[in-house]
A protein has these predicted regions:
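Extended, hydrophobic alpha-helical segments in both membrane/secreted and soluble proteins
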Residues: 41, 263-267, 275-285, 296-305, ...
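Solvent-exposed loop/turn segments connecting transmembrane beta-strands
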Residues: 30-32, 287-292
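Glycine-rich, aromatic-lined ligand/substrate-binding cores of catalytic
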Residues: 548-577
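Transmembrane beta-strand segments that form the barrel wall of outer-membrane beta-barrel proteins
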Residues: 22-28, 277-286, 328
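Residues on the lipid-exposed face of transmembrane beta-strands in outer-membrane beta-barrel proteins
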Residues: 7-11, 41-47, 134-140, 198-202, ...
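Predominantly transmembrane beta-strands of Gram-negative outer membrane beta-barrel pores used
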Residues: 4-30, 42-48, 56-58, 151, ...
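Surface-exposed loop/interface segments of Gram-negative outer-membrane beta-barrel transport/assembly proteins
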Residues: 1, 30-34, 40-131, 149-261, ...
C-alpha cells in the first residue's frame, strides 16, 4: 500500500513571513522491484527589511530511492513493450525458482532473456537521487510604480551508485547473458544548474491610459559529470562493492555543459479597459551554436478590443464579454546537441606494425552553420461570454516554421560518423481552435459542461524540391505533410494455398521477386507490386496518411458539485494521424 504524509507550518509577522513543509512518500509499485521512496522538504522565507526593500529565499530538497526493476540500464529493453508481446501461456517461474523460456517449444537453445518477470528481477539494487534547488531574491521599490528585482537559482542533482546481478536460466546462478559471470556497476551522475535574472518593472497611469513596462536579462548555465566503473565475477551475491568482484575492471566518464543568455523587454498599453496593446522583444544566445550564429531575435505583439465596454453595447444585457484579438510573434528553438557545430573526436584503437595503438577518431560530423529554428505565428481570435453561463473562444492561426532542425541522411562515403542536425526545412501549419463551456446551477447542484475542437493542416513548404528524406517510415517531401508515412501497401495475408500459389508464381517469373524483402510464408503479408516489375522493393512504397501530427483533436469535459461532493470527467481524442510501429519485441 502507498503512503503519502505531509506537514505544513506557516506564520510570521508584518515584516517577516515563513512557510515550512515536509513530505514522506512510499510507493511500493504494482510490480516486483519497482518501488519508490522519497523524502522532501521546502522552506520559503521573506523579510521586508525596509518599506522599499525585501529579501527572501526559497529552498527545496528531495532524497529519493527507487528500485530498478523497470530500468533496464544494461540495455534499451522496454519492459512494457515486452509485456505486451510475451508468449501466451508462458511459465514465468518454475517451482524450483528457474525462469521460464519465452521461445516456441522447437526453438534451440531456449532463452528467458525477455521473460518479463525475469526482467523485473534482473536488476538488483537501488538508485538514490538527491535534488536541491535554492532561489535567493531581492526586490527594490525606490518610488511608486518602479520595481527592481534580482534572483539567483541553484540546482544540484546527484544520483548515487547502482549495481546489477543477472541470473542464469537453468541453475539460478548469477550471470550476465553470454558471459556466465556476474557484474557490479557503480554510477555517479552529478548535474549543476545555475540561473541568474534581473527585472525592472514600471507601471503608471496617464488619464485613462495604463502603462506597464518590463526590461530584463537572464543567464543560465548547465554542467553534467557522469562516471561509471564496473567489474565482473562477484564473489558473493550479498557483496555489492567493486572490490567484491575479481575480473574485467572498466571505467568511463563524460562531461557536458551548455549556457543561455537572454535580454528581453515588454510594454503593455491599456486605454480605458477597451483597447489593449502588448509588444515584446527578446534576444537569446545559445552556446549550442557557433558565435556567428549564436544570437536569435524574437519580436511579438498583440492587439485586443473589448467591445462589451463600448457605450453602444452597454444595453445588451445578455452579452457579458466580447473581445477581439490579433497577434503576431516569433519563437526560437535550439533543440540540438551541445556540440553539434564543433568537430570532436573519440579515443579509438587501431593496429599498426602488428601492435595495438591508441589514437583518436572523428566519430561525428559537424555543422558550423547551425542556428535557431524560428516559428512565426499569426493568430486572430474571439473571446465571448453570454447569459452569464455560456463562454467560449474561437481562434484561427497560421504558423510558419523556418530553419527546422532535422537530421538528414548522409551519403555512404561518410562512413559510420554521426550526422548532426541541419536547418533544412520549412513547414506551414494552418488551423482553427474552438472551445465552449456552460456553467449553471440546479437547486444546490452546480454543474459544468465543456468541449474543445481543433483542426490543423500542415505542409512542408520548402525542403529540397522533389528530393525526399526518410527516417524510418517518416518522409519529408516538399508539398506534403511533415512525416507522412512512406510504406509498402499490403495486398493480403497469406492464409490459403491459393495465396501461396501467387507467391510461388511471382518467384517463378522472377527469382529476385523477394530479394529485398523475404519471401512471405503462411501468416505473413504479401505486399503490392505497385510499379509492376514483378519484385517487391522500396520502389513499391506509397505515401499514406497525413503525417504523425493529428489533423483533428477534440475533448469533452463535464462535472458537478453538491454540498462538498464533486465529480468530474475528461474525455480526449485525436484522429487523422498516421504512424508506424517499427520496433517490436520478439519472443526470443
Amino acid at each position: 500500500w502507498m503512503q503519502n504524509h505531509t506537514i505544513n507550518i506557516n506564520g510570521g509577522s508584518d515584516k517577516i513571513h515563513y512557510y515550512i513543509s515536509g513530505n514522506y512518500m512510499n510507493n511500493p509499485g504494482i510490480m516486483e522491484n519497482s518501488g519508490y521512496e522519497r523524502y522532501s522538504a521546502r522552506v520559503n522565507l521573506d523579510a521586508e527589511v525596509k518599506d522599499w526593500f525585501t529579501i527572501g529565499v526559497n529552498a527545496y530538497g528531495t532524497r529519493g530511492k527507487e528500485e530498478l526493476g523497470l530500468l533496464k540500464t544494461e540495455s534499451n529493453d522496454n519492459f512494457y513493450t515486452y509485456m505486451q508481446a510475451t508468449t501466451p501461456g508462458i511459465c514465468y517461474q518454475a517451482p524450483d525458482g528457474r525462469y521460464g523460456g519465452v521461445n516456441n517449444s522447437e526453438d534451440d537453445p531456449q532463452s528467458s532473456s525477455n521473460n518479463v518477470l525475469k526482467m523485473l528481477n534482473d536488476v538488483k539494487g537501488n538508485r538514490t537521487t538527491n535534488n536541491i534547488v535554492s532561489r535567493f531574491y531581492a526586490q527594490l521599490r525606490p518610488f511608486k510604480g518602479l520595481t527592481i528585482e534580482g534572483s539567483y537559482t541553484d540546482q544540484f542533482l546527484y544520483q548515487q551508485p547502482v549495481f546489477h546481478d543477472l541470473w542464469n536460466l537453468y541453475d539460478n546462478t548469477l550471470q550476465i547473458a553470454g558471459t556466465g559471470v556476474s557484474k557490479v556497476i557503480n554510477r555517479n551522475n552529478k548535474t549543476v544548474r545555475n540561473n541568474m535574472d534581473g527585472l525592472v518593472r514600471y507601471e503608471t497611469d496617464i488619464d485613462r491610459l495604463n502603462i506597464q513596462a518590463t526590461v530584463g536579462a537572464s543567464q543560465e548555465a548547465y554542467r553534467n559529470n557522469w562516471f561509471e566503473a564496473s567489474k565482473e565475477n562477484l564473489t558473493s551475491s550479498e557483496l555489492t562493492e567493486l572490490n567484491a568482484a575479481t575480473a574485467n575492471a572498466t571505467a568511463t566518464g563524460t562531461y557536458s555543459n551548455w549556457a543561455m543568455r537572454s535580454f528581453f523587454g515588454r510594454v503593455n498599453l491599456n486605454w480605458d479597459e477597451k483597447y489593449l496593446l502588448e509588444a515584446n522583444l527578446r534576444a537569446d544566445a545559445s552556446s549550442r551554436f557557433a558565435k556567428k550564429y549564436r544570437w536569435g531575435y524574437f519580436p511579438s505583439f498583440s492587439l485586443g478590443w473589448r467591445m462589451e465596454q463600448e457605450a453602444f453595447m452597454k444595453d445588451i444585457s445578455w452579452l457579458n464579454q466580447l473581445k477581439l484579438r490579433a497577434s503576431y510573434g516569433s519563437l526560437g528553438n535550439n533543440a540540438v546537441g551541445n556540440y553539434d557545430y564543433q568537430l570532436y573526436y573519440q579515443a579509438s584503437n587501431y593496429v599498426l606494425n602488428d601492435a595495438l595503438q591508441i589514437g583518436m577518431a572523428q566519430r561525428a560530423l559537424s555543422n558550423a552553420a547551425l542556428t535557431w529554428e524560428t516559428s512565426y505565428v499569426t493568430n486572430f481570435g474571439v473571446d465571448f461570454a453570454l447569459f452569464s453561463k455560456l463562454s467560449g473562444t474561437i481562434d484561427a492561426f497560421v504558423k510558419n516554421t523556418k530553419g527546422i532542425l532535422i537530421e538528414l541522411p548522409a551519403p555512404l562515403v561518410h562512413g559510420n560518423a554521426t550526422v548532426p542536425k541541419s536547418n533544412a526545412a520549412e513547414v506551414r501549419n494552418r488551423g482553427v481552435e474552438l472551445s465552449l463551456n456552460w456553467n449553471d446551477k440546479v437547486g444546490s447542484v452546480n454543474y459544468f459542461v465543456g468541449g474543445n475542437f481543433s483542426f490543423v493542416k500542415n505542409k512542408v513548404t520548402k525542403f529540397k524540391g522533389d528530393e525526399m528524406s526518410l527516417n524510418g517510415t517518416n518522409m519529408i517531401l516538399e508539398g506534403e505533410p511533415i512525416n507522412v508515412q512512406y510504406v509498402l501497401s499490403v495486398d493480403r495475408i497469406i492464409q490459403t494455398e491459393e495465396d501461396m500459389a501467387i507467391v510461388e508464381a511471382m518467384e517463378a517469373n522472377n527469382p529476385d521477386a523477394f530479394k529485398q524483402y523475404k519471401k512471405p510464408e503462411y501468416g505473413d503479408f504479401l505486399y503490392k507490386d505497385i510499379d509492376g516489375d514483378g519484385c517487391i522493393t522500396d520502389n513499391d512504397k506509397i505515401k499514406v496518411g497525413n503525417g504523425t501530427n493529428p489533423t483533428f483533436t477534440f475533448g469533452f469535459n463535464f462535472g458537478a458539485n453538491w454540498k462538498g461532493w464533486d465529480f468530474s470527467c475528461i474525455l480526449q481524442g485525436a484522429t487523422a494521424v498516421s504512424y508506424t510501429h517499427l520496433t517490436l519485441p520478439t519472443n526470443r
